[in-house]
Regions:
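Short cytosolic juxtamembrane segments of multi-pass membrane proteins
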Residues: 270-281, 361-362, 528-536
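Glycine-rich helix-loop "coupling/hinge" segments at transmembrane-helix boundaries
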Residues: 113, 212-238, 476-504
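Short helix-to-coil transition segments within interhelical loops
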Residues: 163-192, 359, 437-458
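Peri-membrane helix termini and adjoining interfacial loops of integral membrane proteins
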Residues: 34-45, 116-128, 218-227, 268-275, ...
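Juxtamembrane inter-helical linkers in multi-pass membrane proteins
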Residues: 171, 179-182, 268-282, 317-318, ...
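Membrane-water interface segments at the C-terminal ends of transmembrane alpha-helices
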Residues: 7-41, 50-163, 191-216, 245-262, ...
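Short amphipathic alpha-helical coupling elements at transmembrane boundaries
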Residues: 45, 90-93, 126, 167-175, ...
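Flexible interhelical linker loops that connect adjacent transmembrane helices
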Residues: 4, 263-294
Length: 536
């Protein structure tokens, strides 16, 4: 009896293997390009370079301080946000989530407008007869920017841990008379301490790989990170060998941080409770005052830079800047790259999760985890490292392309995959648990299942993942910093040129347009499924 030949690779495994192979091949190609261009001389001489060790020490030191200054206040801010209900609370929580995807140069421009030598606070001090001595450049400026980005994110993540505490535990603690320190120690701390290490590791990794912030606010050789040293080696000194060596060092450090972060990141099961959001009726005055002060301080950290971008952007140069063709060319380039990178990112992410889901359904858990980890691998190669590898690879083979669209789109798509994975991972598993048996009984599989089940049931998560990927791409500066020129500008690159040439009023208009574009793009894409979309 004739039987149909079985394929070497099952059809359901092809999407994930293809996407994983692409990601791993790109990472490997970039690594080999860096390795081949690394100096072949005595490595001992390199390790004895005092400036190199200063750069490495500063990279770790600023990342450690940034993580510390972000996580410790976030513990108390998260507790305040959990205990208090006030008008605008949901808007504040949404703003906390948005700071992660806010374009770095926009935030930097707002920080300079508030804390700079001629900023709002300097003007206020001058009117009061006081001297403003704070400088937003150097280590203190870098820390301020990193706290601006990461404190809200840490607060949001720790707030989720507090919301997982069963209401019965809180009620029992109140009945036993536990207050203040004892309540924090015995009820809240056991839940927080499981979330703090992975949050701190994530923030440390993000700050260690920070590029645009250090480039804009670094105070010269004393405040230089490894990524900035890579950029300087290629853009100013044109020393590919040194850039390759620094990129390899950065990649090794980031790989270690990624593995540490994955090791610390353990899912916290929500507590089983019948009392959702239970609040202690014995709410003391000093507790309300402390929480109010913390929330007001958080607002004073977040709102002034954003308001400064809006207020400073509406200036007398607005009509002239809007009439410049260069601005609209940069805007179109940013939009084109962001949409293409976002779609490519979501497609690759779905390919990984599709095959991973099938592997898990067949009890091949380890293989499924390996497939998903291939998408997280790109975190070990920050954008500037990946772009450096591409730069050296192309420069030594076919030459640099006339248009950098393809490289920037592809790199930005890869850099956004870890974020898209986090958005789509759990919804994809929920869909599997809900519809898998039904699809098997009806014989729905492959493309038909994707069209009938996944694309309908995942409309909201897909839109959210696409919005995150697009906004992350539109605000990226690390990759464009290497390939950007007068013929290829994105809005962040154009803003950096304006800041560098001291055209502050023109830059304020560009920063405002970039801020509005990001919020508009995120909102429009997130609302694409519609408010009353049916996912059943």
């Amino acid at each position: 009896m004739a039987t149909r030949r079985q394929p070497l690779i099952p059809g359901w495994l092809i999407p994930g293997v293809s996407a994983a192979t692409l990601v791993v091949a790109v990472a490997l190609a970039a690594f080999l390009a860096l390795w081949w261009n690394a100096p072949q001389g005595s490595w001992a001489a390199i390790w004895q370079d005092s400036y190199l060790w200063h750069v490495v020490r500063f990279s770790f030191w600023q990342a450690f301080l940034s993580a510390l200054l972000s996580v410790v206040p976030a513990i108390f801010l998260a507790r305040a946000l959990y205990r208090r209900r006030f008008p605008g609370r949901l808007a504040l929580l949404r703003l906390c989530a948005m700071t992660l995807i806010l374009p770095v140069l926009v935030a930097v421009f707002g920080i300079l407008s508030v804390y700079g030598r001629q900023g709002w606070l300097a003007t206020l001090c001058q009117s009061l007869g006081l001297e403003w001595t704070f400088s937003p450049y150097g280590l203190q400026g870098i820390l301020l920017a990193h706290v601006f980005f990461n404190l809200p994110m840490a607060s949001r993540l720790l707030l989720q841990a507090l919301e997982n505490i069963p209401g019965e535990q809180r009620q029992l603690a109140a009945q036993l008379g536990m207050r203040s320190w004892h309540f924090f120690r015995f009820v809240e701390w056991p839940w927080l301490r499981r979330q703090i290490p992975p949050v701190a590791a994530l923030i440390f990794m993000l700050c260690f790989a920070s590029f645009a912030t250090v480039l804009s606010l670094g105070g010269g050789p004393q405040a230089t990170t490894i990524e900035l040293a890579i950029y300087q080696a290629l853009s100013y000194d044109y020393d590919p060998a040194r850039a390759a060596m620094l990129a390899l060092l950065q990649m090794v450090c980031c790989l270690g941080l990624v593995l540490l972060s994955q090791r610390l990141s353990k899912a916290i099961a929500p507590g089983t409770t019948l009392l959702q959001g239970w609040r202690d009726p014995d709410d003391r005055l000093h507790s309300r005052i402390c929480d109010t002060v913390l929330i007001v301080l958080a607002l004073l950290l977040l709102l002034p830079p954003l308001l400064a971008v809006i207020v400073d952007g509406v200036n007398r140069q607005l009509p002239e800047v809007l009439a410049q063709p260069v601005l609209w060319q940069a805007l179109w380039t940013s939009l084109r790259i962001a949409l293409a990178a976002g779609v490519l990112c979501v497609v690759l992410t779905m390919m990984l999760l599709w095959s991973s889901r099938e592997l898990r359904a067949r009890q091949k858990m380890l293989a499924g985890q390996v497939l998903e980890m291939s998408g997280m691998l790109i975190l070990a190669m920050p954008g500037i490292v990946l772009a450096t590898g591409f730069f050296l690879l192309l420069n030594n083979t076919i030459g640099l392309p006339q248009s950098a669209d393809g490289i920037v789109i592809f790199t930005n798509a890869l850099m956004a995959i870890p974020y898209a994975l986090k958005v789509l991972e759990n919804p994809m598993r929920d869909i599997t648990a809900r519809y898998s048996m039904l699809c098997q009984s009806l014989g729905i599989e492959g493309w038909s299942r994707l069209k009938v089940v996944e694309l309908r049931a995942l409309k909201r998560p897909l839109a959210q993942a696409l919005a995150f990927a697009c906004v992350l791409s539109i605000g990226d500066f690390g990759v464009v910093a290497l390939f950007g020129n007068d013929d290829f500008r994105t809005l962040p690159f154009y803003l950096y040129q304006q800041i560098g040439s001291y055209r502050s009023q023109d830059g304020a208009v560009t920063a405002l347009i970039l801020l509005l574009l990001c919020f508009l793009l995120f909102t429009v894409i997130e609302k694409l499924p519609g408010r009353n979309v049916k996912t059943d």
